[in-house]
Amino acid sequence: MKKINIFCCTIENFDLLNKLPKNIIPLGLGKKDFPSNWLNDKNGKNISNLNKYFGEATGMYWIWKNKLNDYSSDDWIGFCQYRRLWLNDLLDSKQKYSSSNLFSKLLKNDNKNFDTNDSVILQPTFFETDSLRGQFVKNYGSKVLDDCLNLLDANDKNDFKDYLEGNSLSICNMFIAKPLIFDK
């Protein structure tokens, strides 16, 4: 039977995370202390001290360096956030929020996406009136983006420039992948 573990990244200790199904594993990030039954990015090989700069990526790094070998090629590794969980079905916006409503909709191992894919990402978010580059420049200016582009080799730079001219992206550092894909 394939194993599907979703690591739920958080910088806070929320009681709700202790009530999640066993395959959704709380992963505490950053400086704070977390319950002993949680994983945290301060043990083993880690870059926890960089969490204030890289957010969930410190947890992803920790899983990559410390847990990846615990998985077989048929297993799945995923990430979500304490405010954004993977669901099988959409919550009806008129539905009253309760943990039982939420828990009944959480992603299940028998979801058909796991039968036909090696990775799953969020449905993209689309910008209606601007490109990704335009949106970034409006918020942060062009210097940072241009400096980053100049760090890339020619092929990657051109590919990334093309991507930035598009208007869609998958947000939130949420994905689920087979270990081989995650390792890349």
Predicted features by range, described:
Residues 1-184:
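ER/Golgi luminal nucleotide-sugar-dependent glycosyltransferases, focusing on the catalytic module
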